[in-house]
């Protein structure tokens, strides 16, 4: 039997955003757990013990099979794997995963109390919970009503990506999986170029240095935010340059703070490999023939082919993470 649960997430040590996204990815990988909805991440002041760094907080709705206590053990194992050490009540932590509420379930024992005993007292819990489940009834009031009664001072939406898999991948590969040769494209297929433009227009595109250098006149792609992931490149006109993945997350959080945008990794091979763990969907154009490539698309392990359409000169495929 499947149950619906609401999980609170928090962190105030280390790379808080990536730790929370990693926790969400690990939750999604647990047997019997499905992530259904995730709130924005929020900057929040510490609660209880105020002599500690500020927190990031969020809420997630999941479905799960099994007992509440088994779910608790799964969440605690994720906390442990991510370095959670329980030294101080209400103290600083790398990650905190709390079961806030399970629909249709109440329980109270030494291990677990549901609904969470402090649920309606904590604005840092209520704000993200009300975002994803405003009509959820808790002790006679909705989450939105409890939120309106709370002191939400100091709680603001964070410039952080909250999705565990926030990226999409788009590539064109020949029959051998090749994607490039001598720093450039294998071939120019107008049909694929139109597909690429249609998918990415208005979004954010992330590329490696060699891909940037292969663009016509090294100019950014029009109508898109262009980001180069490179530890060697100091700067390039019209491009945002980030030296590593943590810096990329910071920039993407800022670029998507006011409105969500599609985010694509567009190559080359090193960029694909670095960002594939964070991709939820891949668009792959299959080009007929083999063109002597020297760079190749990484295997899409953990993805399933969900759509295949034959074009005039190529085949368009969509893969989704499973």
Predicted regions and their residues:
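Enzymes that bind and transform nitrogen-containing heteroaromatic metabolites
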Residues: 165-322
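Short, glycine/charged-enriched secondary-structure capping and boundary segments
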Residues: 21-23, 52-53, 108-110, 114-116, ...
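Nucleotide and nucleotide-moiety/phosphate-recognizing core
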Residues: 2-9, 13-94, 103-105, 148, ...
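Conserved hydrophobic "DFG−1" position in protein kinase catalytic cores
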Residues: 62, 101-102, 171, 321
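Conserved histidine-centered catalytic loops in small-molecule metabolism enzymes
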Residues: 103-167, 239, 295-322
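A short, local hydrophobic-aromatic micro-motif
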Residues: 34-39, 127, 280, 304-306
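Generic structural signal for secondary-structure transition and capping sites
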Residues: 32, 80-84, 134, 152-155, ...
